[in-house]
Amino acid sequence: MKKVLVVDDSETIRLEVSRTLGQAGFSVLEARDGAEGLAMATKHPDVSLLVLDVNMPVMNGLDMLERLRQDPTTADIPVLLMTTEAEDRLIERAKKAGAKGWFIKPVKPEMLLMATNKLAR
């Protein structure tokens, strides 16, 4: 079973995304912020995909993505970002850091599943 780590400070969104992925047959781990997510990704390098919120306390999703790419154990894990903002500067930073895609919230379940099935390793 492929494992996905969902990182979002909104419990509602985290649960919605986790439920969608769980019902599709993925094993789902959850974290509340980028620092917790980074620790979990490092502890679980067998994660198939990361789904990160951009705007979170403690450590945001872009900072987490950049830190993941610096660690050989997590550098190759595909990452999808979720955001309420579609600013060019955020998209450029996400691309440069190696994000495989991003969604504007609220995320449509069918779009999430299509991307997850394509990217999960």
Language model region names:
Residues 15-23:
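Charged docking surfaces used in two-component/phosphorelay signaling
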Residues 56:
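Receiver (REC) domain active-site loop signature in two-component systems and cognate sites
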Residues 45-51:
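Active-site beta3 strand of CheY-like receiver
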Residues 89, 107-116:
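C-terminal output helix
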